[in-house]
Amino acid sequence: MEKLPILFIFDFDETLSVRASCYPIEELAPNKEKLNLDDINHGYVHVHHCWNRRMNEVHKQLAEQGINTEQLIEAFRTIELNPGTAELFRDIHINNHKIIIISNACDLLIEECLRAQNLLQYVDEIKSNPVRQREPLIIIDEYENPLQTNCTFCQPNLCKGSIIDQYRNSNRYDKIIFVGDGDNDVCAALRLDKADYAFAKYDEESETTYKMYDLLKNQYFKQLKTELLLWKTMKDVHDILKKKNIL
């Protein structure tokens, strides 16, 4: 009987990466006050809701302070990954399964970060906002054009659940395993079936409330068809998968 691969899908910011990927970029600013982050964040939260547009404005402000594209790309390469990521990726690859990253960051950032740590080779595909222009400054387009209006969990520029549906409908997998942390990962978890697994970030010792866990546990638990598993580091994810004889 044919042995089907497992599809592993990871969020990037604060899932694979320790911090949100915007922080090392914004820290490049010689004068952070001149980034006008209050105005930029207001536009994101109250006007357009598109993360790529927010970052385009940050890149523009950085360019006005003399930060060039190569400095931005070097910042992408310094993004710290969650402990255990390398070992987990290698084990998934050795077992002939598939790794997909779905992220509201941008494709270039994720590629450069993973390439710098020799992990890009294990990733089958990255679904994220595409970089349209590198010079004189990096400009990121929306992943979805026209903007999506069907999903209220996800931002208009990228719906993670619809991407999961596309993979499920176009390929055959033994199961789908999704790992995330934020509110825009709820949609992805709710698209999973009974045989799949959803991993939500949770740290009982931290004061941080991780939205994926909080929303799924307290508001959408009855709509969740799959088992909800908790993680703090990628080592936790790896250990759980081994205990379940998935890896």
PLM regions: where:
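Short, flexible hinge/linker loops that cap or flank conserved catalytic cores
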Residues: 1-2, 170
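Alpha-helical substrate-recognition element adjacent to the catalytic core
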Residues: 2-130
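C-terminal cap/substrate-recognition subdomain and adjoining C-terminal extension
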Residues: 84-98, 105-247
